[in-house]
A protein has these predicted regions:
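Short, proline-centered helix/strand-breaking motifs
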Residues: 81-82, 107
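Short, glycine-/small-residue-rich phosphate/pyrophosphate-handling segment
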Residues: 104-146, 151-153
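N-terminal beta1-alpha1-beta2 submodule of the flavodoxin-like/Rossmannoid cofactor-binding fold
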Residues: 1-81, 87-94, 99, 153-171
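Glycine-rich nucleotide phosphate-binding loop and flanking beta-alpha elements
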Residues: 85-86, 117
Length: 171
């Protein structure tokens, strides 16, 4: 299964790359996963979408088209998101909105971080967003309150849930 780990924050000093590296290291131990890390801070997606976009057959700006095959080729996603002001970052919503077919029917899981809530309020708000795109939110989110890295078993449960959904979808 090809897994894309998406770092959703572009803020300087963010914890997202640390959380993504933790998950990536655990995912790479498995022989059932090919893993890509997509850092939205390096994607440089435009923040203004044209009216009616995304529409089938319409080409987006170069940065959007550069990222498209990475998302299209992924079988599953892990969104690494902070909680900012009880929600997820605008950079993540922007990235989600540029694409549609790339999310459809694919499992999405979450690694969230923040203060006391551990980012869970951000995840709560992401569920209906991905639901509207016909993606399937799976597994319990991995929560990192106060930026504390959890036991490896948390990553294993998350990856197992994604792999199971992917396997069931193939049948």
């Amino acid at each position: 299964m090809r897994l894309a780990i998406i770092i959703g924050s572009v803020r300087q000093g963010r914890f997202g790359p640390t959380a993504a590296a933790w998950l990536h290291a655990r995912a790479c131990r498995r022989d059932d996963l090919d893993v890509d890390v997509i850092d939205l801070a390096e994607a440089w997606l435009p923040t203004v979408l044209p009216a009616g976009f995304p529409a089938r057959g319409v080409t987006g700006p170069p940065a959007v088209e550069h990222l498209r095959p990475w998302l299209a080729d992924a079988d599953a996603f892990v969104i690494v998101t902070p909680e900012y002001n009880h929600s997820f970052p605008a950079s993540l919503k922007n990235a989600i909105d540029w694409y549609h077919e790339e999310w459809r029917g694919k499992p999405v899981a979450f690694v969230a971080y923040g203060e006391a809530s551990g980012g869970l309020r951000a995840v709560e708000q992401l569920h209906p967003v991905f639901g509207a795109l016909d993606a399937v939110c799976v597994g319990e989110p991995v929560s990192l309150p106060f930026h504390r890295i959890p036991p490896d078993s948390s990553a294993e449960r998350l990856l197992d849930a994604l792999e199971k959904h992917h396997r069931d979808r193939q049948r």
